[in-house]
């Protein structure tokens, strides 16, 4: 059975976020992120793959649950743009929420995340 583009990238996103929940699954993150991965975080920091793995190894990303919605995918040959909203929770409280854009590239028959950009969503009162 062949997955639709939406199904494929929804599964990749699910795997990506699940790898960041609780104790990070560094092997999965290393596999999903391209070596030239670059993230522009909601706080304005620019972080490469090594920098992000270092943050996770140092337990500087305390998240036990990530929820997502408003998922959309646009695929262009060997590149896909995935947008959505993600909320990051710890100990039953929402820590922050972002609108995110993911850039995926198919290299050597494997989809990997090459870019991430997050924009903070203000907390509602």
Positions of PLM-derived features:
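A beta-strand edge to alpha-helix "cap/lid" segment located at domain peripheries
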Residues: 2-31, 36-125
């Amino acid at each position: 059975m062949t997955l639709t583009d939406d199904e494929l990238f929804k599964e990749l996103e699910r795997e990506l976020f699940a790898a960041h929940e609780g104790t990070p699954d560094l092997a999965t993150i290393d596999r999903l992120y391209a070596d030239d991965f670059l993230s522009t975080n909601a706080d304005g920091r620019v972080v490469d793959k090594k920098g992000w793995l270092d943050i996770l190894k140092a337990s500087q990303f305390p998240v036990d649950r990530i929820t997502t919605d408003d998922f959309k995918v646009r695929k262009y040959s060997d590149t896909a743009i995935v947008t959505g909203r993600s909320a990051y929770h710890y100990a039953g409280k929402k820590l922050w929420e972002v609108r995110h854009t993911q850039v995926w590239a198919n290299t050597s028959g494997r989809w990997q995340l090459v870019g991430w950009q997050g924009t903070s969503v203000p907390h509602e009162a």
